[in-house]
């Protein structure tokens, strides 16, 4: 925008869309030299919409600076000239606050000189006319003011100020003028823009004075502040702080530092003193040295220094006659001195003795020398030491030592670990001679009676402390066809007794059977009546035929190999007119049919069984009815289920399941993490009786010892040399140990469910 001559205004008109209201901006620039600076002009703005006074101010402050603030008559004339007429006129930035008309932009009260009220205004009609309007282009009072209620809607008359954030360098008050501004500098500042700061000049400080200054506005200028202190050994004489005033003068003269003074000293009785005073007599840094006459010694420091606090470094020493400190009487000893009373002066002597059981450590006689020291330290009495003894194997030792570890009057008590017996004295004492009153005892392992394997069974024992000794564990299992009667595991207790009576192996029995009606029964019993291995032969009377198996055997599962047969009278029937559907043998099963009236004719009976490891699901026999229908559907053979294996340790398990998960023929292998060994079998197979061939193993840390290896060989004696040859035998023993059965037995119909070491087979079906 081009400049205009001083005192003239050139209006420019432009339209902008701002907040939905069309605004007409009248702006004028005045180019004039103020304090040798060019400043921008004040710009006036107004809204095209009418608002209440409050909303008018919001509008002005949002888009410009504020509601217009009238500064002089020329400004009023200019506004009346350039602003268009509006019938409800314009709001300006004056409002009644606390009953005083106030310029809201500066919060300054309106002065009488600046008032431009219309005639008979302000009149405050109805006591609510707190805001001011300006009559623009009014025929009766152009440019005059009138008080109005603030809620009335008028146009907002706004301005954009010449004063900016950095005007007057922020070091003075910016005062708006028409088209410009002037600066009223704060105290301590000067210049057209208040850009200069008053200076007080550099402070000259005396010797030993320390100064620390802060200069917020420049070195040694207005508001600079300097604090003073003294070097060590000096004290301040004068003000501790100076400040540069707005007048450019310091608040006071700088202080000076004087040396700190200590109290005067004199030589002690029977002594001399020599002093050095580098600054002043008995002042900071002065030092005095003291010496005592012959036959006396100084008590205290022989050199004193005057410190920065005005105090001597040590109290004044004294000279006292030479004497030795009283020696201490040794504990558990006695002392005899010459002279026996008074102070221990030069040439005094003392002798020492110890009580029984103690020996003197040091000189037995000492003398007070001319230096005030004894010729040797006072001795002490030490309890006689008894020799250390090895702690017996499997034993616990508890010693009380009143005068030191294993010394005179020490008492040691012995006890054996659980499962061991004490042989010898349970308590020994250290005597005054330095010897024990007896030898330490020994602990021998508790033994139980030898254990034998049950008949028709086997036994596996772990004996870490020797054959049939404490902590020995024996597990029992029976041969196939037998069940365990009694505990599966026995332990050798600390009392030397097994935890129970050895078990026996009893033959598994099948249910009792009887001769069929019109038939005969003949049985042979290997292991008792109807025990496992018993075989029964059936036959029928004359004119009767056998329906079913002629021979049945009691199996290891406690079941007969086939249902008992029946005897039926022989009759002649005509050929059947109907046939039942031909039957097929079930998978993994067997079928045997008796055709009385032709193949699969009426009364044909078919018997079904399953191969080893499979159980029948359905009827074990079907009969063909006269209607041509079988009495039931063909049964199926399902693989026997073993209990699911749940590993509660870190054992890794890998299983193959040919007939379904954890079924007959399933084989699981086990492995331990690196650094652990497998305790049990590396493999378990689901057997035909629904039990696993081996117990679940566990993982345990540690290595196999020679003693454990010998134990698993039944306690056989082998020389250490033989075991070491090539490491071969030890490796074989490790392999043997890993395969060792842990004694857990398969479940059978006579087992106690939940007994320690027995697999509980929840899938076992006792029905035929």
UniProtKB/Swiss-Prot annotation:
InterPro entries: C-type_lectin-like, C-type_lectin-like/link_sf, C-type_lectin_CS, Compl-Cell_Adhes-Reg, CTDL_fold, EGF-like_Ca-bd_dom, EGF-like_dom, Selectin_CTLD
Cellular-component GO terms for this entry: external side of plasma membrane; extracellular space; membrane; plasma membrane; platelet alpha granule membrane
Compartments, as annotated in UniProt: Cell membrane
CDD domains, per database record: CCP (cd00033), CLECT_selectins_like (cd03592), EGF_CA (cd00054)
PANTHER family named among the record's database cross-references: COMPLEMENT COMPONENT-RELATED SUSHI DOMAIN-CONTAINING, E-SELECTIN
Family statement: Belongs to the selectin/LECAM family.
Primary location recorded for the protein, binned into one broad class: membrane
Induction statement: By TNF-alpha. Induced expression in lung, liver, kidney and heart after endotoxin treatment.
Lineage: Eukaryota, Metazoa, Chordata, Craniata, Vertebrata
Protein's recorded name: P-selectin
Extracellular topological intervals: 42-709
UniProt comment concerning the protein's domains: The C-type lectin domain is required for binding to integrins. Binding to soluble integrins alpha-V/beta-3 (ITGAV:ITGB3) and alpha-IIb/beta3 (ITGA2B:ITGB) is cation-dependent. Binds to the allosteric site (site 2) of integrins and activates them. The interaction with integrins may mediate cell-cell interactions and cell adhesion.
Single GO molecular function: oligosaccharide binding
Superkingdom of origin organism: Eukaryota
Residue ranges annotated for the Sushi domain, each copy included: 198-259, 260-321, 322-383, 384-445, 446-507, 508-569, 578-639, 640-701
């Amino acid at each position: 925008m081009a400049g205009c001559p001083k005192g003239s205004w050139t209006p420019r008109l432009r339209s902008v869309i701002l907040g939905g209201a069309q605004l007409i901006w009248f702006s004028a620039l005045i180019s004039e030299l103020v304090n040798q600076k060019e400043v921008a002009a004040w710009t006036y703005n107004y809204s095209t919409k009418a608002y209440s006074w409050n909303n008018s101010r919001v509008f002005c402050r949002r888009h410009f600076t504020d509601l217009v603030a009238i500064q002089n008559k020329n400004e009023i004339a200019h506004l009346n000239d350039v602003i268009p007429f509006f019938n409800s006129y314009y709001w300006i930035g004056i409002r009644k606050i606390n009953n005083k008309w106030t310029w809201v932009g500066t919060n300054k009260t309106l002065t009488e000189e600046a008032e431009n009220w219309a005639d008979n205004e302000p009149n405050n009609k109805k006591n609510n006319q707190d805001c001011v309007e300006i009559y623009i282009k009014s025929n009766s009072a152009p440019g005059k003011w009138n008080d109005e209620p603030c809620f009335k809607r008028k146009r907002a008359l706004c301005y954009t100020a010449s004063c900016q954030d950095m005007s007057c360098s922020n070091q003075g008050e910016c005062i708006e003028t028409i088209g410009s501004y002037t600066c009223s500098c704060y105290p301590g500042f000067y210049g057209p823009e208040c850009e200069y700061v008053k200076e007080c000049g550099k402070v000259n400080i005396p010797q030993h004075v320390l100064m620390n200054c802060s200069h917020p506005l420049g070195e040694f200028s207005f508001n600079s502040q300097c604090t003073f202190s003294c070097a060590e050994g000096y004290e301040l004489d004068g003000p501790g702080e100076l400040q540069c005033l707005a007048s450019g003068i310091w608040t006071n003269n700088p202080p000076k530092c004087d040396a700190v003074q200590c109290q005067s000293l004199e030589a002690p009785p029977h002594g001399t003193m020599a002093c050095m005073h580098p600054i002043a007599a008995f002042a900071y840094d002065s030092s005095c040295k003291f010496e005592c006459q012959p036959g006396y010694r100084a008590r205290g420091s022989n050199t004193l220094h005057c410190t920065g606090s005005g105090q001597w470094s040590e109290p004044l020493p004294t000279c006292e006659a030479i004497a030795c400190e009283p020696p201490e009487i040794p504990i558990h000893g006695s002392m005899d001195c010459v002279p026996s009373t008074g102070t221990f002066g030069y040439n005094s002597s003392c002798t020492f003795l110890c009580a029984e059981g103690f020996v003197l450590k040091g000189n037995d006689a000492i003398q007070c020398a001319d230096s005030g020291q004894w010729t040797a330290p006072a001795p002490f009495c030490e309890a006689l030491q008894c020799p250390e003894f090895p702690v017996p194997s499997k034993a616990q030792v508890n010693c009380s030592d009143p005068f030191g570890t294993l010394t005179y009057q020490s008492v040691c008590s012995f006890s054996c670990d659980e499962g061991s017996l004490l042989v010898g004295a349970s308590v020994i004492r250290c005597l005054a001679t330095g010897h024990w009153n007896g030898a330490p005892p020994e602990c021998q392992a508790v033994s139980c009676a030898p254990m034998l394997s049950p008949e028709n069974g086997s036994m596996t024992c772990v004996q870490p402390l020797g054959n049939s000794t404490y902590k020995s564990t024996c597990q029992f299992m029976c041969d196939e066809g037998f069940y365990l009667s009694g505990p599966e595991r026995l332990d050798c207790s600390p009392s030397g007794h097994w935890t129970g009576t050895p078990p026996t192996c009893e033959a598994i029995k099948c249910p009792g059977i009887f001769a069929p009606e019109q038939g005969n029964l003949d049985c042979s019993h290997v292991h008792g009546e109807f025990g496992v291995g018993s075989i029964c032969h059936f036959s029928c009377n004359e004119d009767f035929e056998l329906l079913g198996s002629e021979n049945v055997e009691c199996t290891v599962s406690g079941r007969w190999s086939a249902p008992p047969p029946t005897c039926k009278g022989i009759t002649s029937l005509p050929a059947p007119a109907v046939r039942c559907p031909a039957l097929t043998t079930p998978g993994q099963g067997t079928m045997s049919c008796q055709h009385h009236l032709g193949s699969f004719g009426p009364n044909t009976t078919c018997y079904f069984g399953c191969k080893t490891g499979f159980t029948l699901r359905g009827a074990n026999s079907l009969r063909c009815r006269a209607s041509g229908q079988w009495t039931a559907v063909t049964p199926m053979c399902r693989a026997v289920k073993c209990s699911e294996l749940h590993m509660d340790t870190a054992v890794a398990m890998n299983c193959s399941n040919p007939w379904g998960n954890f079924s007959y023929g399933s084989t699981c292998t086990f492995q331990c993490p690196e650094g652990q060994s497998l305790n049990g079998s590396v493999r378990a197979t689901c057997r035909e009786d629904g039990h696993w061939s081996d117990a679940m193993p566990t993982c345990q840390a540690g290595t196999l010892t020679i003693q454990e290896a010998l134990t698993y060989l039944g306690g056989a004696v082998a020389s250490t040399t033989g075991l070491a040859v090539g490491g071969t035998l030890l490796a074989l023993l490790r392999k043997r140990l890993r395969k060792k059965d842990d004694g857990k037995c398969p479940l059978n119909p006579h087992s106690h469910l939940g007994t320690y070491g027995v697999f509980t087979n929840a899938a076992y079906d006792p029905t035929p």
